Amino acid sequence: MKEKRFVNDNIKRLLVSEYLRKENDNAGFGGMEMKRTPYGTNITLYVNRPGLVIGRHGTKIKEMTETLEKRFAIESPQIEVKEVNTPDLNPQIASKKIALSLEKGWNYRKAGNTSLRKMIDLNAPGVLIRIGGKISGERARAQKFMFGKIKYSGEPARSGVEYGFSEAKLKTGIIGVSVRILKSNYRLPDDIEIKPVKIEKEVENNGAESKGAEGNE
């Protein structure tokens, strides 16, 4: 019973996230957090342009609140909007920017490398950008742009790596763009820190002590 409820909760979370992403795509949707409380459900939206989410006189945020309550059966939803401080280090926003660049006619290498350079300049410890589809020619293939360390599976991937995905709609077909960024404050299990050892030098004392001169009376 608990397992079924866990699965249902995760499915609902994914559906809510997808709905909010589509509703706030033009605001630079960077992800969401959903947490139940004794007073209802707190939903935090991370976006690049908060004003577009709230809407004039708060109309848009009211509409989303009603939809979450009626369509998704979210109990007393309370939406909070937070601005993303560094959009280029948010994988969802970064993947959307790359997708938009491709739709504008950018070459996939230029789009991937431009985004990667921005992340490196912002001191991202690890980045993986993957652009897949008919990026050159008729055959579908994928191109990766990498820097630093990144994890694909296990606990480090779940808790240490943030993920974003977007699609670019081109005449040749759909191009998928995925971005993985290692959190700057996350320490990987294979990271070994070698601390310098402080060696205290022993000074041999042979019993020789300097004595002050004594005067004869």
Curated annotation (Swiss-Prot):
GO terms for biological process: translation. GO terms for cellular component: cytosolic small ribosomal subunit. The keyword Transcription regulation does not apply. PROSITE patterns: KH_TYPE_2 (PS50823), RIBOSOMAL_S3 (PS00548). One of its GO terms (molecular function) is rRNA binding. Keywords: Ribonucleoprotein, Ribosomal protein, RNA-binding, rRNA-binding. Residues 16-85 form the KH type-2 domain. InterPro entries: KH_dom (IPR004087), KH_dom-like_a/b (IPR015946), KH_dom_type_2 (IPR004044), KH_sf_prok-type (IPR009019), Ribosomal_S3_C_sf (IPR036419), Ribosomal_uS3_arc (IPR027488), Ribosomal_uS3_C (IPR001351), Ribosomal_uS3_CS (IPR018280). SUPFAM superfamilies: Prokaryotic type KH domain (KH-domain type II), Ribosomal protein S3 C-terminal domain. Part of the 30S ribosomal subunit. NCBIfam families: PRK04191.1 (NF003219), uS3_euk_arch (TIGR01008). Belongs to the universal ribosomal protein uS3 family. HAMAP family: Ribosomal_uS3_A (MF_01309_A). Binds the lower part of the 30S subunit head. This is Small ribosomal subunit protein uS3. It comes from Picrophilus torridus (strain ATCC 700027 / DSM 9790 / JCM 10055 / NBRC 100828 / KAW 2/3). The lineage of its organism: Archaea, Methanobacteriati, Thermoplasmatota, Thermoplasmata, Thermoplasmatales.
